[in-house]
């Protein structure tokens, strides 16, 4: 699973996901890509599940780039805990994804293989996505 080696602060505010993505919204590395259409937090487990599914489907020859990185810690309190006594401890990491952001990119394979692999990865995502081809 992906996570930062070290961060400046252990805990973060939740923040807001307003507007569309201004960074990472173009295809840079491959020829095909999976683009987010909704804002969401995508966990490191979901990113890894999608990457594994794509790798299994493409086998050799294709190259996959993961364009998002989970750098935001999400804290959870222990169950059945009373209110107060501070913020919970960090449990997992998420990537903040806005609409328009490329999640995965792929190259070195035929379009039909890429479409199939990316659709399998898209089913692992908690948001609506679309398949994009570099023209």
From Swiss-Prot:
Subcellular location: Plastid, Chloroplast
PROSITE patterns membership: RIBOSOMAL_L16_1, RIBOSOMAL_L16_2
InterPro entries to which the protein is assigned, alphabetical: Ribosomal_uL16, Ribosomal_uL16_bact-type, Ribosomal_uL16_CS, Ribosomal_uL16_dom, Ribosomal_uL16_sf
Coiled-coil intervals, chain numbering: none
Gene Ontology MF annotations: rRNA binding; structural constituent of ribosome
GO cellular component: chloroplast; mitochondrial large ribosomal subunit
Cysteine pairs bridged by disulfides in the record: none
Family: Belongs to the universal ribosomal protein uL16 family.
NCBIfam families named in the record: rplP_bact (TIGR01164)
Protein name per its UniProtKB record: Large ribosomal subunit protein uL16c
Organism: Populus trichocarpa (Western balsam poplar)
């Amino acid at each position: 699973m992906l996570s930062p080696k070290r961060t400046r602060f252990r805990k973060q505010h939740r923040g807001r996901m307003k507007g569309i993505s201004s960074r990472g919204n173009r295809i840079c590395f491959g020829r095909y890509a999976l683009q987010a259409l909704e804002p969401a937090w995508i966990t490191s487990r979901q990113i890894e599940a999608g990457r594994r599914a794509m790798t299994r489907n493409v086998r050799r020859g294709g190259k996959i780039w993961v364009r998002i990185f989970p750098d935001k810690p999400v804290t959870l309190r222990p169950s059945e805990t009373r209110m107060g006594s501070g913020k919970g401890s960090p449990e997992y990491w998420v990537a903040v994804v806005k609409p328009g952001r490329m999640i995965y990119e792929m190259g070195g394979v035929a379009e039909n293989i890429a479409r199939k692999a990316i659709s399998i990865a898209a089913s692992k995502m908690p948001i609506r996505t679309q398949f994009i081809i570099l023209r």
